[in-house]
Design a protein with these regions (language model features):
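Conserved sequence signature across two-component system core domains
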Residues: 20-21, 44, 64
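Short hydrophobic/Thr-rich beta-strand motif most characteristic of the beta2 strand and flanking loop
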Residues: 38-45, 53, 115
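Short acidic/polar segment at the start of the alpha1 helix of CheY-like receiver
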Residues: 23-27
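Active-site residues of response regulator receiver
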Residues: 67
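Receiver (REC) domain active-site loop signature in two-component systems and cognate sites
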Residues: 70
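Non-catalytic signal-transmission and effector/linker regions of two-component phosphorelay proteins
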Residues: 1-18, 28-35, 55, 59-60, ...
Length: 157
């Protein structure tokens, strides 16, 4: 679990987003995008790590963005278990798999927004802001709409 420095208070002023992905490249890219939009971000390598974080830091996370296909626990199961802990926690599913390969899993969670990788910071912003609101204060950096996952072949979902 990365927390990007210990100098931050336990409960940041900005809404905090938890990014869950078993692949380093999309996890770090999504984390950077979330921060470029002005939000705080935490990252987890899988669903088990994400659930531990949610249990250990109740009320800190305002949104979970999770990959669909991961070892140990898929994004759908993570969504169910996270909602058991925090019933109104917004969750976004994401994947680079072709829709035909994950359609059944996505269809099982019609209430959850879905992001197809690769996506832009602007696409992410359009999903995040209605769910948790804009950042409390303007961020020093501008969201880089050109930040994209550059190598789809390097990760599997």
């Amino acid at each position: 679990m990365s927390t990007r420095g210990d100098r931050r208070s336990r409960f940041p002023a900005e809404p905090t987003v938890l990014i869950v992905d078993d692949e380093e490249t999309p996890r770090s890219t999504t984390t950077r995008m979330v921060r470029s939009l002005g939000y705080e971000a935490r990252a987890a390598r899988d669903g088990r790590e994400a659930l531990r974080y949610l249990q250990q830091h109740p009320g800190e996370i305002r949104l979970v963005i999770t990959d669909v296909i991961m070892p140990y626990m898929d994004g759908g199961e993570l969504a169910e278990r996270a909602r058991d802990l925090h019933p109104r926690l917004p969750i976004i599913l994401m994947s680079a798999y072709p829709m035909g390969e994950i359609a059944e899993l996505i269809a099982a969670y019609p209430e959850l927004p879905f992001l197809e990788k690769p996506f832009t910071a602007e696409t992410l912003r359009r999903l995040v802001v209605p769910l948790i609101g804009p950042p409390v204060k303007p961020h020093g950096r501008r969201a880089n709409d050109r930040v994209r996952y550059r190598d789809r072949a390097r990760y599997s979902g």
